[in-house]
Amino acid sequence: MPERGRASAGSKAADVGGVGAVDAAAVEAADVEVGVADVLAAQARLRSYLPITPMHHAERFGVMLKLENLQRTGSYKVRGALNAMLAARERGDSRPVICASAGNHAQGVAWAAYRLGVPAITVMPHGAPENKIAGVAHWGATVRQHGDSYD
């Protein structure tokens, strides 16, 4: 196991401003199946935190649109972030959270952390849109800029 803040040889991991390293190969090797019970559990967790967003029939295209842009963060990405943090809380895990994102996921993590009173760090690449950085900072998350891309 690599030391905290150091990448093991050959891994795609990085020390990000002293917050530690994540081994990308280990993350990719995690095989997770999501079933109906998982979806229903997530729905139950999120019910009291997020509004039900409306559906809109776009007749011209023959599709239904779920208006997740009406979430506080402007994106559906808050759902996954909040669900993960609530599930961690159910397991008794109240550690700070960290994510890597250039925008919507980072804002979702920041809002969820704010709502749950959990410290959050978002790692965003240099060149991330200023409005996304400001959105993350607005919810109180620490923004660390690292690298020039998502890789």
Give the residues covered by each predicted segment.
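PLP-dependent amino-acid enzyme catalytic core
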Residues: 1-151
